[in-house]
Amino acid sequence: MSLHQRSPESLPVAIIGAGPVGLAAAANLVERGIEFVIYESGDEIASSIRQWGHTRLFSPWKHVVDPASRRLLEATGWQLPAPEGLPTGAELVENYLEPLAALDSLAHRIRTGVMVEAVTRRGMDRTRTARRASTPFLLRARTVEGVEEFTARAVIDTSGTYAYPNSLASSGLDPLGLADVTDRVSHALPDVLGRDRARFAGRHTTVVGAGHSAANTLLALAELTEQEPETRITWLIRNASAVRVTTSDDEGLAARASIGRRVDALVTAGRIAVVDRFEIVRLGRTDDGVRVYGSRAGELVEHDTDLVVSATGFRPNLAMLREIRLELDEIIEAPKRLAPLIDPNVHTCGTVEPHVFAELTHPEPGFFLAGMKSYGRAPTFLLATGYEQVRSITAWIAGDITAASNVELKLPATAVCSTVCS
């Protein structure tokens, strides 16, 4: 049964997050003539991307623009930037997302500065079942005016994961002592060569993490050492090697392969010191920086540094969904049917199958996780896949089950990956 058969059509669809996937959901709803409201926590659209706007994506323009959004934009004379060019996050916002959000069909439906803190059913906690599917959703949000509540016929949560990093500690909990050194620990993807340059120049930075966010920061720090020779770099990983970063013979995406080769070369040249098999348990403050306490090969060890960059990946904020009936994989916290397709122990970006609404459903009819948040803790998210998700979800909301069930995404033979996006 589709949503239009159960829920009041007079209510809008609520989209949480005005990043690329949230705006793509809106574009698809525009084409289907369905009312919606986007609730964005930041003061501007794409607030998470703006924080790492200096970082260049691995994927070219032709793979990072949603088809429905492109149709709406091209109707106004907009042109796709150089299809093979690789945009930075800032260029993605300036040349695509801002023009999209400014369209008459979207602009008046976007509310910024609205932090959704909880989603439930109106008058129902998660234990009540009778007439649940036909009861509107209720969103509670914090705004500049205070706490407000909104109702919706369906909810698409595209709020991303960038604001919710994984722990530095191997336990998954914040390391002991973190509160004492927060001023010396940076979030993933700091702007080392731009606004954050003074913080890192001439200092010893330890980058923690084994993915491409870590690699991008390592490369930026290496470039900084050429201008500020006193700058030192340590790369701390908990496994024996950083398999997602190091060069692979079968890597088909040139930009991503280049990162692996460049990091390998810097390590070989001794410009990046690698400390492997280090599991962090505690952080302590020193006169000049941070002391990292951990276990390495079964022995207690210490590592001193001026600054720490936490590039350990991200996790979804599920606390806001406590009253929603979710069915999540117990390991990666993705929708149960999607999880086997994206398990990072099995799949890379190039092997994740396209999927539609059926893989994204929960026991809560009309509620969907989409975009980066739908991948839980898996690091293999593709923007193109997020666009396909919301195309299918919005078709289901419209009652077009045939379109919702069809897979329209045609992935190229090689991987198509984005850096972190909301």
Question: Where on the chain are the PLM-derived regions?
Answer:
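Residues at the starts of beta-strands that form the adenosine-phosphate
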Residues: 12, 35, 204, 229-232, ...
